[in-house]
């Protein structure tokens, strides 16, 4: 449930829980005076590659929108603006948009924020704007707890929230200590509150504080700088600090599929010069060449780690698709996905059961209309994933690789990687082809070649092959089939309609053949795969299976076939991070997506880039830890 708010006669939003307004009718002017000017912005970020703002109370997003507008208007702006904001009680997207009606210049930005402001369950949510150059990371939960957990580094701090009289926990010394732990020496802080307890708390935490004249009707504001008289004790992070020295440079990415393209795009947006070495004659020649596939969140009664990761992944995938320039309906669609629990077990968290429940914007019990559209009985156990959909991964790969900072180099199978001495005492990596020629050289290499990543990873990386075969055909060849209007997953999955050529294609599968690497599969194995896929469809969508049977197993049937080898780890989670930071500096990995590459690859690319650049993480730190290479035992 979103936080209910009231509206005062002057049109400003008011929170009945705290008995305080979010901002006054002069809110935009106050935001600029108190927070931007108080932190020396936009001047302070001039010439910087990245700027990180931390805010303690998001409210209706006014300070974020004002900062974004200042970034857009500044020709000396940083390439990347991070805005991290805490919010325990998020308002609805519609109320957020309504609150900006008096600030016309912000309304286009507010509409963009409104479009992404959904599904804000407790935890961390990354929203992306301006092609990924403005990143809003929302910490939904208690500010003190979230800051202690995430430990983002801030260049500027907006200390904001409801009055200390009505919300003292947000201003107490414990929260201020959590804020201070996120500051570097020289970080500037600004707030509208001049309460004595706030001034004393900031001073106690190492800030030099001064009271300055305010913009009427405010008499005074506070400005501060983190400059403790002591040397701050280093915080022990949950994840090791592996940021690269010197900022963006050049990097080689081995692999031209979804993982490699996601990493390449994330780094290129940050100013890296990226060269993708791909053994294929064209991008996405391996497992990412799937004709079409489903992306959807995972659900579990305890809202497991994988469930939380998958939601972050779906959000990142949608952001990539929306920014890609691809055609919705032809190349992808966020049409929703029906999940049929063929074993009849209930897997949705109990608190998510109602339409108004906290998780309903993500997943909820399927209604009668959805079940009827899929040809399933009304008593079927099934869920509707409102933010799921389908995509044609090869087209997304090509769109990602089109960034001007990326050079794709095909027919470039890497046979050997070697560290070499570079000028200035640095170490570079050289990639050699099978004939011994140097394909490319760079200070950093990211291995993102799926199962082909094995030669570059130590033996302690337990990755295994997982061959998958799908069946596909054109809708025109099966006019009698009872097609659902949306993808369905569960035991296998079906994309009923992808693209428009020839009426569109359908795709179903996939097999999970552990240990199998032979490509293409033998004819007998292909026939067995078609039979296995048809058997899954019989359980998943019995009505459709009956109508589609002639195209799969009827006389003269010749269903389309596609196969590839995926890569998976024993815990079914990808590896994202340095391969061996102590002994192989500059070598990174982003691989082992398993069967969830469409859902997780974009998130993993952003996570790797964030770790390489020392940025706020796009996920909860415990989720990042679960994906990290540091989870592996040392040699």
From Swiss-Prot:
Pfam family, one: DAO
Gene Ontology MF terms in the entry: flavin adenine dinucleotide binding; oxidoreductase activity, acting on the CH-NH group of donors; tRNA (5-methylaminomethyl-2-thiouridylate)(34)-methyltransferase activity
Compartment(s) where it occurs, according to its Swiss-Prot or TrEMBL record: Cytoplasm
GO cellular component terms, A-Z: cytoplasm
Region (tRNA (mnm(5)s(2)U34)-methyltransferase): 1-227
The entry's keywords: Cytoplasm, FAD, Flavoprotein, Methyltransferase, Multifunctional enzyme, Oxidoreductase, S-adenosyl-L-methionine, Transferase, tRNA processing
Gene Ontology BP, a term: tRNA wobble base modification
Region annotated FAD-dependent cmnm(5)s(2)U34 oxidoreductase, chain positions: 254-635
Main location: cytoplasm
Entry superkingdom: Bacteria
Name of the protein: tRNA 5-methylaminomethyl-2-thiouridine biosynthesis bifunctional protein MnmC
Organism: Paracidovorax citrulli (strain AAC00-1) (Acidovorax citrulli)
Essential cofactor(s): FAD
Catalytic activity, EC: 2.1.1.61, 1.5.-.-
Catalytic activities: 5-aminomethyl-2-thiouridine(34) in tRNA + S-adenosyl-L-methionine = 5-methylaminomethyl-2-thiouridine(34) in tRNA + S-adenosyl-L-homocysteine + H(+)
Family: In the N-terminal section; belongs to the methyltransferase superfamily. tRNA (mnm(5)s(2)U34)-methyltransferase family.
Name of the gene this protein is made from: mnmC
InterPro entries recorded: FAD-dep_OxRdtase, FAD/NAD-bd_sf, MnmC-like_methylTransf, SAM-dependent_MTases_sf, tRNA_MAMT_biosynth_bifunc_MnmC, tRNA_MNMC2, tRNA_S-uridine_synth_MnmC_C
Record function comment: Catalyzes the last two steps in the biosynthesis of 5-methylaminomethyl-2-thiouridine (mnm(5)s(2)U) at the wobble position (U34) in tRNA. Catalyzes the FAD-dependent demodification of cmnm(5)s(2)U34 to nm(5)s(2)U34, followed by the transfer of a methyl group from S-adenosyl-L-methionine to nm(5)s(2)U34, to form mnm(5)s(2)U34.
SUPFAM superfamilies according to UniProt: FAD/NAD(P)-binding domain
């Amino acid at each position: 449930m979103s936080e209910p708010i009231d509206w005062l006669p002057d049109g400003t939003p008011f929170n009945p829980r705290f008995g305080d307004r979010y901002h006054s009718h002069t809110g935009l002017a106050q935001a600029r005076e108190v927070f931007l000017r108080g932190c020396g912005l936009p001047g302070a970020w001039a010439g910087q590659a990245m700027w990180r703002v931390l805010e303690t109370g998001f409210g209706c997003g006014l300070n974020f929108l004002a900062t974004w507008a200042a970034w857009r208007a500044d020709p000396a702006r940083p390439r990347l603006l991070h805005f991290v904001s805490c919010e325990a009680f998020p308002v609805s997207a519609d109320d957020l948009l309504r609150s900006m009606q008096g600030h016309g210049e912000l309304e286009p930005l507010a509409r963009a924020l409104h479009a992404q402001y959904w599904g804000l369950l407790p935890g961390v949510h990354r929203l992306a704007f301006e092609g990924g150059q403005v990143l809003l990371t929302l910490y939904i939960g208690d500010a003190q707890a979230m800051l202690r957990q995430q430990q983002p580094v801030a260049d500027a701090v907006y200390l904001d929230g409801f009055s200390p009289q009505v919300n003292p926990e947000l201003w107490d010394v414990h929260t201020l200590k959590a804020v201070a732990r996120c500051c570097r020496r020289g970080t500037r802080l600004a707030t509208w509150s001049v309460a004595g307890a706030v001034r004393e708390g900031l001073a106690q935490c190492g800030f030099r504080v001064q009271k300055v004249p305010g913009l009427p009707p405010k008499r005074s504001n506070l400005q501060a700088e983190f400059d403790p008289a002591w040397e701050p004790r280093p915080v022990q992070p949950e994840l090791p600090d592996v940021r690269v020295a010197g900022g963006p440079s050049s990097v080689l990415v081995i692999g031209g599929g979804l993982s490699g393209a996601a990493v390449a795009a994330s780094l290129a947006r940050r100013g890296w010069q990226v060269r993708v070495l791909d053994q294929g004659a064209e991008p996405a020649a391996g497992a990412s060449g799937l004709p079409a596939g489903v992306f959807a969140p995972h659900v579990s009664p305890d809202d497991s780690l994988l469930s939380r990761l998958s939601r972050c992944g779906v959000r990142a995938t949608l952001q990539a698709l929306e920014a890609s320039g691809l055609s919705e309906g032809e190349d992808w669609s966020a049409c929703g996905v029906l999940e049929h629990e063929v074993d009849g077990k209930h897997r949705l968290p109990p608190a998510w059961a109602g339409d108004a429940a906290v998780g309903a914007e993500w997943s909820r019990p399927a209604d009668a209309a959805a079940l009827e559209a899929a040809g399933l009985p009304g008593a079927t156990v099934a869920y509707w994933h409102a933010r799921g959909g389908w995509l044609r991964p090869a087209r997304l790969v090509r769109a990602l690789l089109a960034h001007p900072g990326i050079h794709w180099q095909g027919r470039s199978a890497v046979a050997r990687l070697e560290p070499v001495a570079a000028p200035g005492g640095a170490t570079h990596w050289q990639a050699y082809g099978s004939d011994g020629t140097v394909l490319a050289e760079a200070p950093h290499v990211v291995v993102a070649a799926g199962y082909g990543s094995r030669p570059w990873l130590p033996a302690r990386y337990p990755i295994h092959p997982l061959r998958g075969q799908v069946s596909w055909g054109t809708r025109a060849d099966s006019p009698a089939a009872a097609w659902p209007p949306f993808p369905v997953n569960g035991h296998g999955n079906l994309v009923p309609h992808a693209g428009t050529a020839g009426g569109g294609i359908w795709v179903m599968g996939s097999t999970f053949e552990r240990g199998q690497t032979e490509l293409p599969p033998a004819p007998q194995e292909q026939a067995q795969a078609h039979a296995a896929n048809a058997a899954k469809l019989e359980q998943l969508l019995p009505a459709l299976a009956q109508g589609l049977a002639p195209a799969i197993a009827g006389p003269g049937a010749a269903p389309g076939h596609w196969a590839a080898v995926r890569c998976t780890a024993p815990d079914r989670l990808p590896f994202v991070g340095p391969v061996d930071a102590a002994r192989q500096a500059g070598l990174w990995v982003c691989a082992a997506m398993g069967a969830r590459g469409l859902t997780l690859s974009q998130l993993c690319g952003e996570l790797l880039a964030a770790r390489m650049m020392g940025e706020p993480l796009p996920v909860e730190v415990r989720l990042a830890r679960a994906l990290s290479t540091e989870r592996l035992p040392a040699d």
